[in-house]
């Protein structure tokens, strides 16, 4: 089992929904994010030092979020190399759809590719944006 599958268009809709939830804003149509959504994106520090929020990851050091997304960002990765990262501070959703298991599952440096892509997107959208403080 490799998780959930979708396409870029639907994942963008989901990302926009999550962004609205993190900002406490309503969406134009459809299911509204719960009022508690923003609290689900805050790092829980459990166990101590963990970067995990409730169902989400948050940026820490070298992560799949790259180095430019804000510390308020939250995201999730998938086994096949996919990722979604949402930055409420800059109102950005980044989706990466890949298949890291083709032709082989032996791709130990694949996590770095996610970070490179996230940084490339952020640099394109926000030229000169500084790295996130650690």
Task: Give residue ranges: language-model regions.
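Catalytic loop of the DD-peptidase/beta-lactamase superfamily, centered on the K-T-G motif
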Residues: 1-134
